[in-house]
């Protein structure tokens, strides 16, 4: 059975997410993006009336949704918050290795390196708060004393860990992150 190709809009979003993650917002040209997505020239503005900036917001949302699913898949079967963090960090480390050990955070690479505008910053804040909210949900589920603080610590460890892993070109940094999270379980 052959798979149906993704609709053009989805191909544009996924391709943009990958390219922005690799080279940042300003490092990706529209011609290259359209060629990589195998999309006709008019399709970008058909699906994203404001062009590259609308596509950047959509691609960051798509990437964030992938991370939210990864957080949920790591914590839902876990028996403790620490076990969920171990699972999450293991999965993130595998993604790091698969990415070639250089790609940045898909949201930071897109929204913080994009146009200097309040819309991009507000969108990044909203997406990151979603990760923290998901982490706090699981911290609360495991009865941790300060779920918000625990989730913020998780977020900071993941973001900082990814940066250090990039600098060291080693996913070991990511695998060791759970050791740095205070244990309460």
Each model region followed by its residue ranges:
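Short hydrophobic clusters on alpha-helical segments that form packing/core surfaces
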Residues: 12, 16-20, 92, 135, ...
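N-terminal intrinsically disordered/low-complexity leader segments
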Residues: 1-7
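Hydrophobic alpha-helical connector segments
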Residues: 71-101, 151-154
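Amphipathic C-terminal alpha-helical segment
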Residues: 95, 113-116, 137, 155-173, ...
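Helix-turn-helix
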Residues: 11, 15-58
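Amphipathic alpha-helical segments used for helix-helix packing
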Residues: 56, 83-87, 96-119
């Amino acid at each position: 059975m052959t798979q149906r190709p993704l609709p053009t809009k989805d191909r544009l979003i996924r391709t943009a997410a990958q390219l922005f993650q690799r080279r940042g917002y300003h490092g990706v040209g529209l011609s290259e993006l359209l060629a990589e997505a195998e999309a006709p020239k008019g399709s970008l503005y058909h699906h994203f009336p404001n062009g590259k900036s609308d596509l950047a917001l959509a691609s960051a949302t798509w990437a964030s949704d992938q991370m939210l699913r990864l957080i949920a898949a790591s914590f839902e079967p876990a028996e403790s918050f620490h076990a969920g963090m171990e699972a999450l960090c293991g999965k993130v480390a595998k993604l790091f290795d698969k990415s070639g050990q250089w790609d940045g955070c898909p949201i930071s690479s897109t929204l913080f390196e994009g146009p200097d505008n309040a819309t991009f910053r507000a969108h990044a804040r909203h997406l990151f708060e979603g990760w923290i909210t998901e982490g706090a949900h699981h911290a609360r589920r495991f009865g941790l004393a300060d779920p918000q603080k625990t989730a913020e610590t998780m977020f900071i460890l993941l973001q900082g860990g990814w940066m250090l892993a990039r600098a060291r070109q080693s996913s070991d940094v990511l695998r060791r992150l759970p050791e740095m999270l205070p244990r309460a379980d």
